[in-house]
Amino acid sequence: MRFYKIISFMLLGLDDTDSPDGMCTTYLGALIANELKRRGFTVTNHRLVRLNPNVIWKTRGNAGISLEISGGDSTVVFEIACEFVERFARFECEKTNPGVVVVESPPDPAFYYQALQRFCTIEETVKRLERIGALYKGYKNGRGLIGALAAVSSVLPDKTYECLAYRKNEVLGTPRIYAEEGFFTSEEQTAPHTWDTVDFIRREIVCVPHGKDPVLYGIRGDTPKWAIKATGFLETEEPAFSQIWETNQGTDAHLLPLPDGGPIEGESYRFSGVVESLPITNRGGHVQFTILSNGMEIPVFAFEPTKYFRNAVRELVVGDEITICGSFQKGVLHLEKFRPNLLATQKSRSSPRCPICGGRMTSAGKDKGYKCRECSGKVRDVPDQERTLQTKWYEVPPGSRRHLAKPAVRMKDDI
């Protein structure tokens, strides 16, 4: 006879079950949650945890999930989770290496922060799992154990929510059916409490994926109430079901202060400095400048996929004091957003208008100011050029934003 222990609290972690060609770890997690409820367990929280976006071996968005569960035996939960992983995970993909973890108390959050802001190895993850007495199983090389342990170790001082709607099995792999206008109406009616639903400037839908995964759409918001309200304006194919996930998305949780020794490959930072070189546009449309911070010169790039964001970057001039956020990869900082703190004075590059007759003036000679050909009026000083940048956050378009990056609508108090 088998005896079961009724546990009042446990956490299930899951990661790395998807692939670029299909499946989604949140979908599999939701299926497991539904099965657990069917078997009499109580699932009190569904959490989606984004990790270091610079990890090169991620399948897609580098996220793990955790479920908070009570009312049954942890061994049964573990067996159900493994059964679903073995049935649904995309093992044929080289990068798909699932991991399942069950613990009966929250592990030290230090591991979560390491996976979020730096890097973890499979070996150190397994050692931690052994040390805390977790139930765990890694498939193939077991890399998914990192995200699974990070998810159950996570703490969210700042949190957001995402309502994910999933497609029916019979339509998977076919084009998604939806009315575009409903998404624009949804954002108009619920912003700034929701974000990244659409890009109004480019007239693009952002929250609908284009791949073969089972997600129909994902609406992100400050609270479950706002995320659910936003879905009421949508006209889409009928989803199989929806699930609200508590997340660290849109929180800037991945950002670190700049180390004294300089930026480290694969880490993300927020820091202030002074623009050292005028932005230039490279071949391919990438905009580059240099920032000086703590005596270090750091190359900064706004890459072509950030589209109209580059226009704001081009307005920077030498001497501007700014705060920037971004990831350091391959020796350059990938700019996510910036805020001017103090704009430098810049002399106008064009000849001024005559203050008497309004005509265009010409140079009167080196250090002699300008003179008017029409009325002989003179001005001594070159006027300052009007700056268009404001003291506010400038950010990449919604379609280019990383999952963890905090949108400007959530930074109104960050001035």
UniProtKB/Swiss-Prot annotation:
Superkingdom of this protein's organism: Archaea
Any Pfam family the entry gives: TiaS_TCKD
Class in the EC hierarchy, top level: ligase
GO molecular function ontology, one term from the record: ATP binding
EC numbers, comma separated: 6.3.4.22
GO CC terms in record: cytoplasm
Catalytic activity: cytidine(34) in tRNA(Ile2) + agmatine + ATP + H2O = 2-agmatinylcytidine(34) in tRNA(Ile2) + AMP + 2 phosphate + 2 H(+)
Keywords, in A-Z order: ATP-binding, Cytoplasm, Ligase, Nucleotide-binding, tRNA processing
One biological process term in Gene Ontology: tRNA wobble cytosine modification
Primary location group: cytoplasm
Record carries keyword Glycoprotein: no
Compartments, record wording: Cytoplasm
InterPro entries (UniProt xref): TiaS-like_TCKD, TiaS_FLD, tRNA_Ile2__agm2C_synt, Zn_ribbon_TiaS
Function summary: ATP-dependent agmatine transferase that catalyzes the formation of 2-agmatinylcytidine (agm2C) at the wobble position (C34) of tRNA(Ile2), converting the codon specificity from AUG to AUA.
Similarity comment text for this entry: Belongs to the TiaS family.
Protein name: tRNA(Ile2) 2-agmatinylcytidine synthetase TiaS
Phylogenetic lineage: Archaea, Methanobacteriati, Methanobacteriota, Stenosarchaea group, Methanomicrobia
Gene symbol of the encoding locus: tiaS
